[in-house]
Amino acid sequence: MAEKKARFLAETGEFEYISPYNDYDIIAGQGTIGFELLEQLPNIDNIYISMGGGGLISGIGSVIKYHSPTTKIIGVSAINSGALAASIKLGSVCETAHFDTLADGCAGGIDEGTLTLPIATEVTDSVIECTEEQIVEAIKILVWNENLMVEGSAALALAGFMQEKQSKKHERNLVLLCGGNFDKNKILSILN
């Protein structure tokens, strides 16, 4: 919705539209997180990253793969809005059905000719898709066990990790929790 409004305002000529993902500067900015991760935790086996338009996974994945090529990048997508996940599997931009998702920061399609698809395809080792129920469970785990209140898009990464937790229990796993734009009423209804 915000992206639509931004595009509309840009069409008036008074504003410039900057994509939240389809821009080299945005991708590079997201990549700085990769440098921070490597500085603080240099021996990570797997990194779970929520996927929307692909800016975050492209930026972080590029830095990680360059400096730590054995680290696996696992993209996590909401089943209700999985255009990037489907496009990575297909190898080209494809449109998918979009339904409401708690991971609304990751919702929506990707632009034809997007910069992120070839980058994300190259740096992503695997993709996990999550249901809304799995995202709800991840939000609850973060609130009750970690005392963290994050948006659904951040909890999406944990929901993906939870699917592989047992098989990766002897590895060094990092779940990227990036995003605190939560609707308090929505979170409260999940917790009740």
What do these predicted regions represent?
Residues 1-192:
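PLP-dependent amino-acid enzyme catalytic core
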